């Protein structure tokens, strides 16, 4: 249900189970909304993500052994700035049978209505993706953000893949100094008009009817984040959106993703799933296995496995 205290109450329950290896906790089917109210804020240095200050975790499993959380087919929806699931300093943890999404995606979408070499008209649903034009910039708002669009990616209306003959298109903002300098204005009917200047022009492959994915938010949190843990398994998990990667493990040993899908949320019409890689492994050892997973429309790599350089202090 839509209860702002749900995450805090779940955390209190989990604290009583930490010292009881072998517990299986099963959720009833349904839709659960998670809010950061009443939760402690943490500053995690998450590999390949942007620093964002403190953030709360919806599900926080630290120091658990042989623990299973069965979502029972439930759907978890996260509000404001939250890291949905974190597993750390644990072993034998299983997460299964649930889907993860954000109430307000950290990216937005629009549909091209008209396109010329230097002018484009785009329709943006103000209910799904609240927006306005401020000081000549296209600004999107959410429960915890107000940010100017700095980049878009055009998606083919039929294939829902990046449109042929286009690529990432960058726009200048207060923090991004390289890119186009368009004149942007709002028009009637929830339309926005983007007019380029001088010798700037839109890609020849741009077409009316195609969708634009607007980027306007930093990469702040994966949907599932595992750190310093061993023998971790995620099975029958669906990540529909995340403010970063779908799954990220660092300094872990023996990790299995089985039917771990990163796909756009059904019925939303979205052309994007995770804001970055579907799955990412950093400095992990043992066996890393992916079985029967489906990754689509994430906005970076499907799978990335690597180490990193770090400073060792004696």
Predicted regions located by residue number:
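Acidic Gly/Asp/Thr-rich repetitive segments characteristic of extracellular carbohydrate-active
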Residues: 1-25
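Extracellular beta-strand-rich solenoid/capping regions of secreted or surface-exposed proteins
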Residues: 11-18, 34-68, 77-96, 104-120, ...
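A structural signal for short, well-ordered beta-strand segments and their strand-loop junctions
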Residues: 25-28, 70, 86, 247-249, ...
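All-beta strand scaffolds that present successive hydrophobic residues in beta-strands
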Residues: 27, 67-71, 92-97, 208-209, ...
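Acidic/polar low-complexity surface segments
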Residues: 33-59, 103-220, 259-282, 298-314
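Conserved catalytic-core segments centered on acid/base and nucleophilic motifs
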Residues: 237, 246-248, 279, 290-296
């Amino acid at each position: 249900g839509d209860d702002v205290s749900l995450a805090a109450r779940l955390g209190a329950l989990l604290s009583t189970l930490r010292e009881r290896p072998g517990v299986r906790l099963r959720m009833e089917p349904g839709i659960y909304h998670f809010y950061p109210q009443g939760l402690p804020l943490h500053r995690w240095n998450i590999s390949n993500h942007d620093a964002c200050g403190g953030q709360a975790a919806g599900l926080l499993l630290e120091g658990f052994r042989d623990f299973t959380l069965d979502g029972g087919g439930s759907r978890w929806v996260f509000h404001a700035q939250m890291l949905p699931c974190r597993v750390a300093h644990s072993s034998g943890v299983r997460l299964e049978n649930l889907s993860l999404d954000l109430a307000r995606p950290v990216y937005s979408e629009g549909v091209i209505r008209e396109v010329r070499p230097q002018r484009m008209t785009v329709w943006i649903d103000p209910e799904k993706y609240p927006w306005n034009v401020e000081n000549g910039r296209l600004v999107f708002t959410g429960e915890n953000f107000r940010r100017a669009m700095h980049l878009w990616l055009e998606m083919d209306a039929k294939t829902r893949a990046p449109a042929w003959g286009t690529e990432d298109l960058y726009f200048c903002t207060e923090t991004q100094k390289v890119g186009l300098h368009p004149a942007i204005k709002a028009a009637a009917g929830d339309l926005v008009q983007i007019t380029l200047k001088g010798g700037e022009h839109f890609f020849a492959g741009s077409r009316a009817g195609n969708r634009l994915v607007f980027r306007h938010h930093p990469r702040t949190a994966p949907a599932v984040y595992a750190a310093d843990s061993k023998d971790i398994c995620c099975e029958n998990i669906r990540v529909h959106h995340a403010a970063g990667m779908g799954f990220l493990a660092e300094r872990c040993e023996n990790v299995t993703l089985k039917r771990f899908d990163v796909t756009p949320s059904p019925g939303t019409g979205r052309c994007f799933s995770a804001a970055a890689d579907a799955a990412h492994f950093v400095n992990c050892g043992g066996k890393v296995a992916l079985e029967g997973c489906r990754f689509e429309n994430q906005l970076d790599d499907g799978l990335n496995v690597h180490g990193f350089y770090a400073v060792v202090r004696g």
